[in-house]
Amino acid sequence: MSQKIEKVAVLGAGVMGAQIAGHLANAGIPSFLFDISQELAEKGKETLTSLKPAPLYKPKNADLVTPCNYDDHIANIGEADWILEAVVERLDIKDLIYSKLLPHLKDSAILTSNTSGIPLTDLTASMPDDVKKRFMITHFFNPPRYMQLLELVRGEH
């Protein structure tokens, strides 16, 4: 299967989510950077130009990151080819986020988690089979721009 990734939705604007969105911007890929409030999403984007070491090749790359919140911008999920979840390492919170986004997920979208400790089978337990087929773990290491390492874990589907 070959699919071009033209837009990504990064769920979670904390340390990892914001830097992953920034690194996607370094590759010229626009993203929606989601968090529970618009303020947190904006703050995540702002950190891209202030963190050391710098997550962006050029500060202008931050223009490719669009801060979003789940209440006002959830429909943007439907524009994303890849939805990358990078929220806190709690299964109950991840499940809540998945339940919000699944109705907006386009049929060809890939859904992944940046988890480093929750088993894939636990993450997908309540997902429909067609989504399980498109789900995997994509664990970036911190800081993503400098740690050229990505752990990939696929499921049985």
Predicted regions, residues:
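Conserved N-terminal Rossmann-fold NAD(P) cofactor-binding segment
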Residues: P30-D81, R90-D92, L96, M127
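Phosphate-coordination loops involved in phosphoryl transfer and adenosine-cofactor binding
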Residues: K4-K7, A62, A80, S108
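Short amphipathic alpha-helical segments
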Residues: A21-H23, K45, D95-Y98, L123-A125, ...
